[in-house]
Amino acid sequence: LLKDEALKPKQKAQVKLIEQKAENMSDLIAQLLFLSRADQGRQQIEKENVNLSELTEMIVGEQQFLAESKGNAGQIICHIEPEIWAEVDETLYIRMMINLLSNALRYGEGRDIEVSLSVHNDSDIIGKVKDHGIGISKGDIPHIWERFYRADKSRTGGSHCGLGLSMVKWIAEAHGGSVEVVSKEGEGSEF
């Protein structure tokens, strides 16, 4: 419809809005189905040996491109050790990183974001996503992993319904890892 020459600018804007809302609804349904399968122990994990360094850089590049196309001026700065390999479900890792990066971009207020990936003690892989944005209040931090919880109630709408961090937590734990947050209001958050 958007390519239809007969549509007036206002009609094209309305069609574009409808398409965006449909995409948001599709994302929400996919997240709910994922978490439902996880609750029932039916969410499959298909691990394979993956170069996390290259995969993380690819995800960062895609998210940077999307952010720039939406007018976000901040840069994603990478500190990624080369050749970090691990047995992971590539699709779930991508989903986890996109959730963390999209949150950092959304709440980072256009400031730079830092992504790091390193190995400690020869086997522990540590990944971090840090923004310098609005941060999370101390009172909200214990609840951010809960489904549908939104620390920033003033930012509503879109496809952001408070499921992303519960998915991040599930994915990390399903791979034998964990996720934590350090945050201070007005200074940003690090996951």
What spans do the regions from the language model cover?
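Short acidic helix/loop segment immediately C-terminal to the autophosphorylated histidine
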Residues: 2-9
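Conserved micro-motifs of the catalytic ATP-binding
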Residues: 10, 40-45, 85-88
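Short alpha-helical segment of the dimerization/phosphotransfer core of two-component systems
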Residues: 20-25
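Conserved catalytic submotifs in the C-terminal HATPase_c
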Residues: 46-49, 73-84, 120
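Short helix-loop "hinge" at the ATP-lid/N-box region of the Bergerat-fold HATPase_c
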Residues: 104-105
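Short conserved segment of the HATPase_c
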Residues: 136-148
